[in-house]
């Protein structure tokens, strides 16, 4: 495990990078230097490896699902939930691809991670994988705005991201879902980093699997990779591991959040009007100190609107 923090960026430099990135409202492109982005990747990589693969976090915390390069929507989420370090954040992965500003999105999140390493936490999504983001937009954005070398630096950083988080020993968070190989949380802690994402097995499933409304047990996924799992699988896993809730991203849901398995699993998706193709809302999940969950809904932004957010009543203890 790498714990050395040599060569970390100075706080003043980080604050300047964050300030410049936050000026990119209204669709304005923010062009950091290649040297600055390399430093962000290298420093963040050190921090990821110094923290566990199964993060152990505490409420209160705000949880965000997929962002997919929709930088303006990320800024809207921070406007509502509070900019770090005023609130604790956990992001469930899929920062890049499909949206227009993957670079701004991942650079702001990495900069915040380095600046406030105990206030903001980033999990790995299935798009934080060279095989996937080579195809779905991030590679092309890096190549167009910088070069392929920089994309490879990001790949080295992504290979060190943690894959799951446990909030107050009761809420388990990951990007995708459960795995037929997963019996206890110790197995997640044992996954070695840095690592690529394999085509099958525990790590693959944690980032790729989906809940299945129609079938019980385990079923092959229509995605052509990993599997789906029924409500019975969720109940069995939570009961055996003394957990209350699974929180995951990975799927577009119309209202930004969607419950499954008698509210024992929730899907969070934080990219409204995803890719300009879906009329979905985005959501931000707030977990208070009593583990009471509430949702803030981010409606697709009309061109003239600045912050169309709606608060949903509290949902009771998870």
Swiss-Prot record:
The protein's name: Serine/threonine-protein phosphatase PP1 isozyme 9
Residues that coordinate or bind Mn(2+) 2: 94, 126, 175, 250
Signal peptide coordinates: none
Pfam families (alphabetical): Metallophos, STPPase_N
Active site (catalytic residues): 127 (proton donor)
InterPro entries: Calcineurin-like_PHP_ApaH, Metallo-depent_PP-like, PP1_catalytic_subunit, Ser/Thr-sp_prot-phosphatase, STPPase_N
Assigned keywords, A-Z: Cytoplasm, Hydrolase, Manganese, Metal-binding, Nucleus, Protein phosphatase
Cofactor note: Binds 2 manganese ions per subunit.
UniProt key word RNA-binding: no
Keyword Kinase: no
Binding site for Mn(2+) 1: 66, 68, 94
Gene Ontology molecular functions: metal ion binding; protein serine/threonine phosphatase activity
A GO biological-process term: root hair cell tip growth
GO CC term (a single one): nucleus
Enzyme Commission number(s): 3.1.3.16
Cellular localization per UniProt: Nucleus; Cytoplasm
UniProt function note: Serine/threonine-protein phosphatase that possesses phosphatase activity toward para-nitrophenyl phosphate (pNPP) in vitro.
Family to which this protein belongs: Belongs to the PPP phosphatase family. PP-1 subfamily.
Major localization class: nucleus
Cofactor(s) in the UniProt record: Mn(2+)
Reactions that this protein is recorded to catalyse: O-phospho-L-seryl-[protein] + H2O = L-seryl-[protein] + phosphate; O-phospho-L-threonyl-[protein] + H2O = L-threonyl-[protein] + phosphate
């Amino acid at each position: 495990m790498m714990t050395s923090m040599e060569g970390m960026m100075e706080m003043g430099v980080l604050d300047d990078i964050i300030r410049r990135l936050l000026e990119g409202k209204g669709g304005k492109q923010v062009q950091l230097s290649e040297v600055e982005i390399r430093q962000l990747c290298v420093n963040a990589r050190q921090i990821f490896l110094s923290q566990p693969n199964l993060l152990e976090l505490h409420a209160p915390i705000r949880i965000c699902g997929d962002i997919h390069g929709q930088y303006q929507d990320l800024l809207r989420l921070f406007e509502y939930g509070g900019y770090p370090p005023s609130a604790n954040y956990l992001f469930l992965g899929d920062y890049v691809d499909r949206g227009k500003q993957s670079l701004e999105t991942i650079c702001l999140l990495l900069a915040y991670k380095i600046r406030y390493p105990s206030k903001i936490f980033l999990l790995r999504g299935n798009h934080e994988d060279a095989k996937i983001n080579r195809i779905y937009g991030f590679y092309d954005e890096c190549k167009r705005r910088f070069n392929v070398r920089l994309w490879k630096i990001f790949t080295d950083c992504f290979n060190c991201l943690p894959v799951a988080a446990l909030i107050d020993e009761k809420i388990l968070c990951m990007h995708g879902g459960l795995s037929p190989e997963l019996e206890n949380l110790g197995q997640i802690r044992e996954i070695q980093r840095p690592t690529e994402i394999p085509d099958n097995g525990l790590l693959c499933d944690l980032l790729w699997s989906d809940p299945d409304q129609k079938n019980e047990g385990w079923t092959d996924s229509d995605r052509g990779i990993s599997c789906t799992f029924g409500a019975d699988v969720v109940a069995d896993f939570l009961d055996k591991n003394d957990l209350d809730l699974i929180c995951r991203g990975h799927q577009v849901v119309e209202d930004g959040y969607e419950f499954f398995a008698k509210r024992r699993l929730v899907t969070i998706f934080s990219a409204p009007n995803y890719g300009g193709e879906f009329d979905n809302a985005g959501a931000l999940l707030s977990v208070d100190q009593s583990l009471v969950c509430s949702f803030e809904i981010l409606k697709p932004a009309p061109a003239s609107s600045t912050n169309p957010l709606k608060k949903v009543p509290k949902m009771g203890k998870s």
